[in-house]
Amino acid sequence: MREAGYGAIIDWSETIAKPADAEDFAEKAIFVVIASGFKSATAKPIAERCMLALRAGLSSATEFGHPGKQVAIDRIWAEREEMFAAYEAETDKLRFLISLPWVGPVTRFHLEKNLGGDHAKPDVHMERLARRDKTDTHKLCRRLARETGYRVATIDTVLWRACAEGLLNSKIYEKKGWKAAFHPKRFLASND
Protein backbone atom coordinates (compact mmCIF):
# COMPACT_ATOMS: atom_id res chain seq x y z
CA MET A 1 0.00 0.00 0.00
CA ARG A 2 2.84 2.40 0.78
CA GLU A 3 4.44 1.63 -2.61
CA ALA A 4 1.11 2.42 -4.30
CA GLY A 5 1.08 5.89 -2.77
CA TYR A 6 -0.94 5.26 0.38
CA GLY A 7 1.81 5.97 2.91
CA ALA A 8 0.19 9.24 3.95
CA ILE A 9 -3.06 7.56 4.97
CA ILE A 10 -1.16 4.94 6.97
CA ASP A 11 0.81 7.69 8.71
CA TRP A 12 -2.45 9.60 9.38
CA SER A 13 -4.04 6.49 10.91
CA GLU A 14 -1.07 6.01 13.20
CA THR A 15 -1.21 9.59 14.48
CA ILE A 16 -4.86 10.70 14.36
CA ALA A 17 -5.10 13.77 16.57
CA LYS A 18 -7.84 14.30 19.12
CA PRO A 19 -10.07 17.31 18.35
CA ALA A 20 -8.35 20.56 19.26
CA ASP A 21 -11.58 22.41 20.02
CA ALA A 22 -15.34 22.44 19.49
CA GLU A 23 -15.04 23.55 15.87
CA ASP A 24 -12.63 20.71 15.06
CA PHE A 25 -14.97 18.25 16.81
CA ALA A 26 -17.98 19.52 14.85
CA GLU A 27 -16.13 19.46 11.53
CA LYS A 28 -15.14 15.82 12.04
CA ALA A 29 -18.67 14.88 13.12
CA ILE A 30 -20.15 16.68 10.12
CA PHE A 31 -17.81 14.87 7.75
CA VAL A 32 -18.89 11.49 9.13
CA VAL A 33 -22.57 12.44 8.82
CA ILE A 34 -22.02 13.43 5.18
CA ALA A 35 -19.79 10.42 4.41
CA SER A 36 -22.36 7.90 5.61
CA GLY A 37 -23.52 6.17 2.45
CA PHE A 38 -21.10 8.03 0.18
CA LYS A 39 -17.62 7.33 -1.10
CA SER A 40 -15.02 9.41 0.72
CA ALA A 41 -14.07 11.14 -2.54
CA THR A 42 -17.69 12.25 -2.95
CA ALA A 43 -18.16 13.28 0.68
CA LYS A 44 -15.00 15.38 1.04
CA PRO A 45 -15.91 18.26 -1.32
CA ILE A 46 -19.48 18.32 0.01
CA ALA A 47 -18.15 18.57 3.56
CA GLU A 48 -15.76 21.37 2.57
CA ARG A 49 -18.60 23.36 0.97
CA CYS A 50 -20.87 22.78 3.98
CA MET A 51 -18.15 23.98 6.36
CA LEU A 52 -17.67 27.16 4.33
CA ALA A 53 -21.42 27.80 4.46
CA LEU A 54 -21.64 27.11 8.20
CA ARG A 55 -18.69 29.39 8.98
CA ALA A 56 -20.42 32.10 6.93
CA GLY A 57 -23.53 31.75 9.09
CA LEU A 58 -25.55 29.83 6.49
CA SER A 59 -27.31 26.48 6.64
CA SER A 60 -25.68 23.39 5.19
CA ALA A 61 -28.82 23.20 3.04
CA THR A 62 -27.22 25.77 0.74
CA GLU A 63 -24.62 23.15 -0.22
CA PHE A 64 -26.15 19.73 0.44
CA GLY A 65 -29.49 18.34 -0.65
CA HIS A 66 -30.15 15.61 1.93
CA PRO A 67 -32.91 16.98 4.23
CA GLY A 68 -32.26 14.68 7.21
CA LYS A 69 -28.52 15.19 7.12
CA GLN A 70 -28.96 18.97 6.72
CA VAL A 71 -30.85 19.13 10.01
CA ALA A 72 -28.20 16.98 11.74
CA ILE A 73 -25.31 19.03 10.33
CA ASP A 74 -26.86 22.36 11.28
CA ARG A 75 -27.62 21.09 14.79
CA ILE A 76 -24.08 19.76 15.31
CA TRP A 77 -22.68 23.12 14.21
CA ALA A 78 -25.11 25.14 16.35
CA GLU A 79 -24.50 23.00 19.45
CA ARG A 80 -20.80 22.30 18.89
CA GLU A 81 -19.59 23.88 22.15
CA GLU A 82 -22.04 21.88 24.27
CA MET A 83 -21.48 18.67 22.31
CA PHE A 84 -17.70 18.97 22.52
CA ALA A 85 -17.81 19.64 26.27
CA ALA A 86 -20.06 16.61 26.78
CA TYR A 87 -17.77 14.47 24.61
CA GLU A 88 -14.70 15.56 26.56
CA ALA A 89 -16.41 14.79 29.90
CA GLU A 90 -17.71 11.36 28.82
CA THR A 91 -15.61 8.31 29.68
CA ASP A 92 -17.52 6.08 27.23
CA LYS A 93 -16.96 8.05 24.03
CA LEU A 94 -18.74 5.52 21.79
CA ARG A 95 -21.88 5.63 23.93
CA PHE A 96 -21.90 9.42 23.77
CA LEU A 97 -21.32 9.59 20.01
CA ILE A 98 -24.36 7.46 19.22
CA SER A 99 -26.45 10.23 20.83
CA LEU A 100 -25.39 12.71 18.13
CA PRO A 101 -27.81 13.32 15.27
CA TRP A 102 -27.34 10.97 12.31
CA VAL A 103 -24.62 8.98 14.11
CA GLY A 104 -25.58 5.34 14.46
CA PRO A 105 -24.13 2.09 15.77
CA VAL A 106 -21.63 1.78 12.89
CA THR A 107 -20.86 5.43 12.17
CA ARG A 108 -19.98 6.07 15.81
CA PHE A 109 -16.85 3.94 15.27
CA HIS A 110 -15.94 5.95 12.16
CA LEU A 111 -16.38 9.20 14.08
CA GLU A 112 -14.47 8.07 17.18
CA LYS A 113 -11.63 6.88 14.94
CA ASN A 114 -11.54 10.31 13.26
CA LEU A 115 -11.52 11.88 16.74
CA GLY A 116 -8.35 9.97 17.65
CA GLY A 117 -9.82 6.76 19.06
CA ASP A 118 -8.24 3.43 18.21
CA HIS A 119 -11.25 1.69 16.66
CA ALA A 120 -12.32 -0.18 13.56
CA LYS A 121 -15.55 0.65 11.76
CA PRO A 122 -17.63 -2.49 11.12
CA ASP A 123 -18.77 -1.49 7.64
CA VAL A 124 -19.75 -3.89 4.87
CA HIS A 125 -16.17 -4.57 3.68
CA MET A 126 -14.79 -5.15 7.15
CA GLU A 127 -17.68 -7.39 8.18
CA ARG A 128 -17.16 -9.58 5.09
CA LEU A 129 -13.46 -9.94 5.85
CA ALA A 130 -14.23 -10.81 9.47
CA ARG A 131 -16.95 -13.34 8.63
CA ARG A 132 -14.53 -15.26 6.41
CA ASP A 133 -12.25 -15.56 9.45
CA LYS A 134 -15.22 -16.50 11.67
CA THR A 135 -14.85 -13.42 13.85
CA ASP A 136 -16.03 -9.80 13.95
CA THR A 137 -14.43 -6.60 12.70
CA HIS A 138 -13.16 -5.52 16.13
CA LYS A 139 -11.53 -8.86 16.97
CA LEU A 140 -10.03 -9.18 13.49
CA CYS A 141 -8.46 -5.72 13.62
CA ARG A 142 -7.24 -6.12 17.22
CA ARG A 143 -5.55 -9.42 16.32
CA LEU A 144 -3.88 -7.93 13.24
CA ALA A 145 -2.83 -4.87 15.24
CA ARG A 146 -1.14 -7.11 17.82
CA GLU A 147 0.59 -9.08 15.06
CA THR A 148 1.82 -6.04 13.11
CA GLY A 149 2.39 -3.37 15.74
CA TYR A 150 0.01 -0.97 13.97
CA ARG A 151 -2.99 0.64 15.66
CA VAL A 152 -6.43 -0.96 15.26
CA ALA A 153 -7.44 2.22 13.40
CA THR A 154 -4.59 1.70 10.93
CA ILE A 155 -5.48 -1.93 10.28
CA ASP A 156 -9.07 -0.82 9.64
CA THR A 157 -7.92 1.94 7.30
CA VAL A 158 -5.56 -0.30 5.31
CA LEU A 159 -8.08 -3.13 4.90
CA TRP A 160 -10.94 -0.78 4.08
CA ARG A 161 -8.82 1.13 1.56
CA ALA A 162 -7.67 -2.13 -0.05
CA CYS A 163 -11.31 -3.12 -0.53
CA ALA A 164 -12.49 0.32 -1.63
CA GLU A 165 -9.68 0.65 -4.19
CA GLY A 166 -10.05 -2.86 -5.64
CA LEU A 167 -6.87 -4.44 -4.28
CA LEU A 168 -9.03 -6.85 -2.27
CA ASN A 169 -12.60 -7.76 -3.20
CA SER A 170 -14.37 -8.32 0.13
CA LYS A 171 -17.38 -10.02 -1.45
CA ILE A 172 -15.20 -12.59 -3.25
CA TYR A 173 -12.94 -12.97 -0.20
CA GLU A 174 -15.90 -13.91 1.97
CA LYS A 175 -16.99 -16.63 -0.46
CA LYS A 176 -13.75 -17.92 -2.01
CA GLY A 177 -10.81 -16.73 0.08
CA TRP A 178 -7.62 -14.79 -0.37
CA LYS A 179 -6.29 -16.10 -3.69
CA ALA A 180 -9.54 -15.39 -5.53
CA ALA A 181 -10.04 -11.94 -3.98
CA PHE A 182 -6.54 -10.40 -3.92
CA HIS A 183 -5.62 -8.46 -7.11
CA PRO A 184 -2.29 -6.63 -6.64
CA LYS A 185 -1.30 -6.53 -10.33
CA ARG A 186 -4.65 -5.09 -11.40
CA PHE A 187 -4.52 -2.62 -8.48
CA LEU A 188 -0.97 -1.46 -9.19
CA ALA A 189 -1.68 -1.19 -12.95
CA SER A 190 -4.68 1.06 -12.27
CA ASN A 191 -2.50 3.38 -10.18
CA ASP A 192 0.17 3.92 -12.88
Predicted regions, residues:
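Short alpha-helix boundary/capping elements
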Residues: I34-T42, E81, H119, K134, ...
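Alpha-helical ds-nucleic-acid-binding substructure associated with the helix-hairpin-helix region
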Residues: F38-W102, V106
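C-terminal accessory module of base-excision DNA glycosylases/AP lyases that mediates lesion recognition
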Residues: M1-I16, Q70, D74-W77, A89-D192
